[in-house]
């Protein structure tokens, strides 16, 4: 579908996953949620999706994600929002069954054709991972938002948690960073066409294939990088026995991201993420803001044994996935995250 400038980002305060509430604030209000033996995922660790056991051989994987427009083309926005929502199921090592549309529609500024194209974009992405859109719900809203409620399935003993990395593992990141920076440049009408095309390709790419490849190498943990930025999601992958050593020079960024960053085109969400992570990295400064950039439809973080990591990386690269080993899991250190 050809990209159309339909001014979607003009009518929203914040774009994509940069509109998420501060992660620190959320932790203080979610401690009332109840546990049950059938709930296999950990409520307290911000898992990517819930895993609920139905039978000895079946667990349902459920997630919900919606975002404000991050691009100005309705079809592309729908596809990106769908890829972003589906990613949570892939990060759990699960298979998507179906999805429901969630729509808040700004009838004052957009006509119904915008909604039609948006839903078409989402439907195409859901079909790409062999699943179905089976319905949804719409309301009128002062700002446009869209996402999916996604249901998947997995064997109860085979889902991949986000905080079970093993000492000695390598951490593979499967997409470059920078969508928050580039989308901020787009909203400021300063993003050139080449960089827009690169950003679109990155965000519309499903994490489905990367997840399928990773599962062949028995990862010890997985997550995806979205609104809390790389450092924020690595924080969620920590446990009491480990720290992460990040190889900063190995991290890939979308073309143009560093230039726009140096121009000051930085989303407010990056500063929120910086505050959230500062307690773990005392010497963290604004030069590291790129590592806090809120991603929309970002890549997977795959924790995998060092022995398997290079072969896994090669398989990902063979599928044109821009993957890199960006960190190593080490014994617990004074600082939980070390940037080298």
UniProtKB/Swiss-Prot annotation:
Q: Is Translocase there in the keyword field?
A: no
Please tell me one Gene Ontology term that the record gives under cellular component: cytoplasm
Q: What SUPFAM superfamilies does UniProt report for this protein, alphabetically? A: PurM C-terminal domain-like (SSF56042), PurM N-terminal domain-like (SSF55326)
Q: Which reaction does it catalyse?
A: hydrogenselenide + ATP + H2O = selenophosphate + AMP + phosphate + 2 H(+)
Cofactor entry: Mg(2+)
Q: Where do the annotations place ATP binding?
A: 20, 45-47, 65, 88, 136-138
- Residues the entry annotates as binding Mg(2+): 48, 88, 224
User: How does the cofactor attach, per the note?
Assistant: Binds 1 Mg(2+) ion per monomer.
Q: What class of enzyme is it?
A: transferase
Site (described: Important for catalytic activity): 20
**What Enzyme Commission number(s) appear in the record?**
2.7.9.3
The UniProt entry's GO biological process terms, in alphabetical order, are: selenocysteine biosynthetic process
Q: Recite the UniProt keywords alphabetically.
A: ATP-binding, Kinase, Magnesium, Metal-binding, Nucleotide-binding, Selenium, Selenocysteine, Transferase
Q: How does it assemble?
A: Homodimer.
Role according to the record: Synthesizes selenophosphate from selenide and ATP.
Question: Known NCBIfam families for this protein?
Answer: selD
Q: Which HAMAP family match?
A: SelD
Similarity remark: Belongs to the selenophosphate synthase 1 family. Class I subfamily.
Protein name per Swiss-Prot or TrEMBL? Selenide, water dikinase
- Say which species the protein is native to: Campylobacter jejuni (strain RM1221)
